[in-house]
Amino acid sequence: MDTEYVRSRFIKHFDGTTGFLYASPGRINLIGEHTDYNGGFVFPGAVDKGMIAEIKPNGTDKVKAYSIDLKDYVEFGLNEEDAPRASWARYIFGVCREMIKRGVDVKGFNTAFAGDVPLGAGMSSSAELESTDRKSTRLNSSHSQQSRMPSSA
């Protein structure tokens, strides 16, 4: 995955400045799919494909997200109850809502992201998006002297 390409799309779709770059690897589960969240055993391994996101606080209570691969833009408020219509944006929404529920003072941010893990191939592309979003939101919160999510979460 090319960080410069992600950065160029971020600059184009947002205010012309840069933010923080975050990466998350794809993974495979060698003993079967969907066992991890159904109480089964897992034997995961990272792969050489993954996701890169550029994220920057925007000083609002809104998340503005651009999926480079899907060429799709979504904006939602952090206090909204209803998830966005775009299925990919629901992962970002869910992570933000859960962090807020756990006491993290999540602030609005702009993000553009892309990945080279095939969608729907059982390589956890949705988990990449969630972990990249959680990691970046948590780090942005700690950079801003805000409360942190417990490490056991």
Predicted regions located by residue number:
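Single conserved hydrophobic/aromatic residue that forms the stacking wall/gate
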Residues: K135, L139-A153
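ATP-binding N-lobe of GHMP and related small-molecule kinases
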Residues: M1-A127, S131-R138
